[in-house]
Amino acid sequence: MKSTLAHKFRGMTFGLIGISILAFTAAACSDTENQSSTPTYENGVVVTAHPEASKVGLEVLQNGGNAVDAAVAVKFALAVVYPNAGNLGGGGFMVYRSKDGETAGLDFREKAPGLAHRDMYLDENGDPIAELSLRGQLSAGVPGAVDGMVKAHAKYGSADWATLLEPAIALAQNGFPLTERQANELNRRKESFEKYNPNGTALLKSEGEWAAGDLLIQEELANTLIHIRDKGRAGFYEGEVADLIVAEMQRGIGIMSLEDLKNYEAQWRDPVIGTYRGHKVISMSPPSSGGVGLLALLKSVEAFPLSQWGFQSDSTIRVMVEAERRVYADRAAHLGDPDFYQVPQATLIDSTYNATRMHSMDFSKASLSDEIFAGEIAGPESEETTHYSIVDKDGNAVSITTTINDSYGSHVVVDGAGFLLNDEMDDFSAKPGSPNLYGLLGGEANAIQPGKRMLSAMTPTIVEKDGELLMVVGTPGGSTIITSVFQVILNVLDFGMDMQQAVDAPRFHHQWKPEHISPENAAIDSLTRLSLEASGYEIINRGNIGRVDAILVLPNGRKQGGADPRGDDVALGY
């Protein structure tokens, strides 16, 4: 039976306690299209974490650029207008699908410097040293963002490289108005910025505190972008900018060298591909755990009638939580950099394997995580990542998730170059087999080694239906990335939501350990909560989960953008 959407999530206030969610039954995409108030676009759509970045991407598309051209321009624009996660000094992953169905994955994840070693964050007693992998020059991995964009443009871009850098340069030179959220974030970190940047940084206001509407001008960052515009890859990994990075290392106790920078290479990798209810799901392969985790979750729940049970019904939540519990246990033990560790990818996304894992589920009571798997779990990834989705008029699609790890990364701005360094080294297991700074165990597959890429949860994803593009989706959110993308896909395919409704809908998270379910802002209704708690599930509320930016292609070919209201995200199209 088909029904209309019973609750408009766009109007809900995140942070409100006691949200009551009505159940949904399945609705066909054509019904969703007819009933939806979400705008649709005939040609291209860009959805990013910042209005200025979305404008940049849309302008590229309108001027004849393709999805990859727009993605490159957006990436550099985000480095200016979204400094807490958009970056030059970080890395990420891209999943690409051409209008003809060709797919590719690009790994521009950061790497450990050549002088890195597995015990580099431990004291003389072998215990992790607080903040050493989180702040300062030693926490930085070798950045991959610039090389990633160079490689993406060289293979799939059509517009002039220099032209794609101009909007970001202008935003850095002329400044852009801070949102209230951004002003508050910068003010909260003032003391840390002063500590790690004794020579000052554009992120520190000369007098008083930042306020919404203040212009953030970043002249040093503009100069770095000009180097990249004029010299491409060499403008960052060699010459003046590279020298400034190494000089910054020497101001602290950093170990990144000119050789590390010169030798960095982003890698083209085959995306991981699977199916869910007749749809083809294309996502990022390791060293991202996202694609494998997402496909394993989808396979784990595929046999259950979720659409009949309804959105966030008691049975739906039980199945999803038990799937998440099992998949995150496997993620902890079996995933790492495939250049250093043999990842059993085929097994982890196999239908029979995941169905068998679900056989131990008991609908009458919660599973105990220690009884599901007693393996080791890697440290969590920060939630300060960013994602953007782009589809051009021809149907080429790009899904990119990028990060510098924690909000504002290492808090170190490269003196003279104006960009923040990542603190991605914290995504390694500082001490395999012992609790890390978060009280979680670290896996051997993710131990620190020179030149190795740290494990990630980033999950840039593209979905097809009957050989045609259907959805482009991804999110920041650290360990919640995989479950957020999982839920948004189910919201569309099982619960008949349109793209904006699927993004707006409240989310929950479970990651094997710790034991509890984490609904955002009391998202699970009170009756369902009581039923789950009576069965032994522990539920602890938390704040917002993820900031999903996604695009849905409707049966008539028009496109919907879904921009997450949890942030300043904006969807634009034409």
Regions found by a protein language model. Give the residues of each.
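Active-site rim segments in enzyme catalytic domains, especially the processed small/beta chain
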Residues: 80-105, 255-257, 397-465, 495, ...
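Noncatalytic scaffold domains of N-terminal-nucleophile
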Residues: 31-55, 59, 67-232, 236-238, ...
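Bacterial N-terminal signal peptides that target proteins for export
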Residues: 2-17
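Internal maturation/activation junctions in enzymes
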Residues: 303-403, 416-417, 424, 432-433
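Extended C-terminal subregions enriched in glycine
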Residues: 431, 452, 485, 494-543
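Short beta-strand scaffold segments in enzyme catalytic cores
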Residues: 86-87, 91-98, 386-390, 460-462, ...
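C-terminal motif of bacterial Sec signal peptides marking the signal peptidase cleavage site
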Residues: 25-28
